[in-house]
Amino acid sequence: FHTSNKKIWDYVNQFADFNRYTNSPVANYNGEIYNLPFNMNTFNKLWGVVTPAEAQAKIEEQRSILGDKRPENLEEQAISLIGTDIYEKLIKGYTEKQWGHKATDLPAFI
């Protein structure tokens, strides 16, 4: 059981003992494990960067491949927001599985 509401936690603990739970989602891309949501651990593993400024610079570099082009599909929209590496490794497969379509066939507004 998981809640951040102390009143609810106190209430349910009247009836049973619960273990502490920490939600730590990860993504598995070709056997490589990445933290989700994205954080400095994710960026360090992707690019070896150690500061937020370095991570931001890498993302900006990758975002710029589209130039001033207006995104025409979900893939282009995602790349324009988070760059190619994060999109390819952590977003594309999940999105295509969820929607049952290639990201290039999905509208940019999703």
PLM regions: where:
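Active-site/ligand-binding neighborhood in enzyme catalytic cores
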Residues: 32-34, 41-110
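A conserved beta-strand/loop capping segment in the N-terminal third of enzymes
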Residues: 1-55
